[in-house]
């Protein structure tokens, strides 16, 4: 076990404190230092409560966003849920439902899907990954099979991925 904090940290289980929040950030900072020094290939984190993390001049939304800030590239990280035969990644995370449509773009879909494709090839040894892209809107009816976001953002992004040689298919109705 690596020590990220030199001093003793008083932790009251289930109670967020400024002290435990500071220790969580020190642990993430240590992980980022070790990352920059190529000391590991994969980072697995424990939950971090955004309620007790206070960083001057920075609004802490979560550890994934903090890591992206440390790395300096919002499109360089991707949370992946991994099962035996299925991997799931999200274009948006911790985004209120009312803001999701405005949070997706062709660029975010292309960059995050490309990152997933590279990861599937490199880390999971999948020779030719096939990626299903879900629709944002539910299927409406036979005359109107997709919404504005599918027509203007998701389908053009899938076409751009195809131009890059990435097998991305969809959009699949998210409600079926």
Where are these predicted regions, by residue range?
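Anion-binding alpha/beta catalytic cores of soluble intermediary-metabolism enzymes, centered on
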Residues: 1-176
């Amino acid at each position: 076990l690596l020590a990220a904090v030199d001093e003793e940290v008083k932790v009251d289980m289930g109670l967020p404190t400024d002290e435990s929040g500071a220790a969580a950030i020190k642990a993430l900072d240590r992980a980022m230092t070790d990352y920059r020094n190529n000391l590991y290939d994969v980072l697995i984190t424990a939950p971090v409560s955004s309620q007790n993390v206070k960083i001057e001049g920075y609004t802490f939304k979560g550890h994934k966003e903090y890591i992206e800030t440390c790395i300096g590239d919002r499109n360089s990280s991707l949370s992946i849920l991994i099962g035996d035969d299925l991997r799931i990644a999200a274009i948006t995370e911790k985004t209120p439902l009312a803001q999701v449509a405005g949070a997706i773009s062709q660029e975010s879909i292309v960059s995050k899907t490309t990152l997933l494709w590279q990861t599937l090839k490199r880390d999971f040894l999948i020779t030719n990954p096939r990626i299903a892209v879900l629709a944002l809107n539910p299927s409406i009816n036979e005359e109107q099979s997709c919404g504005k976001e599918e027509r203007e953002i998701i389908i053009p992004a899938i076409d751009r991925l195809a131009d890059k040689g990435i097998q991305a298919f969809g959009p699949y109705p998210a409600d079926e």
